[in-house]
Amino acid sequence: IIKVRKQTPQMNTQTPEQQYQELYQKLYILCEEQGWGDPFSYARSREIHMAGILGHKINDDYSGADAFDSEGGCEYKSTIAKSINATYNGISVQDTWEDQERYLIEDKIGKYRNHYYARYEGAEVAEIWKLIAPNVLDIVLPKVKKQYPKKRSGNAKDPRIGVTVSRKEIYQMG
């Protein structure tokens, strides 16, 4: 008779967030070694990764806030560029400049107090910066205002507004 010793399952002492951090890095390395490219071309995986690093709760809905910090909903932006920057793309054009400004302040950028910008090097976060909405609006509103007339007139190939927050602006305001 062969006695089989029943193994007790090991307790996993890692939180789901810690497990995600570990698996995220392993998946990236595997894809890199196989020449498969960046497995996270859509920003959602980076949002989940950033939330784990920052101790935030990821939003389970794909619309609205990316995550929630101690002050409420927050916005995440990430880049793999050599210099940190953030882009706000696909901003809907409103009927008047007053409506456009109100939309940005109340419904889009100003809706979330904290905006977090991360720069990735491979699977690692090289830097994360936090800007508050009033500072982001100080940067973004003049850029939107400059694009607004052409976008509003319908003479642009892409009718939506897109603006970039530069490295210099992030460093100055963050």
Enumerate the language-model features and the residues they cover.
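Nucleic-acid endonuclease domains
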Residues: 1-174
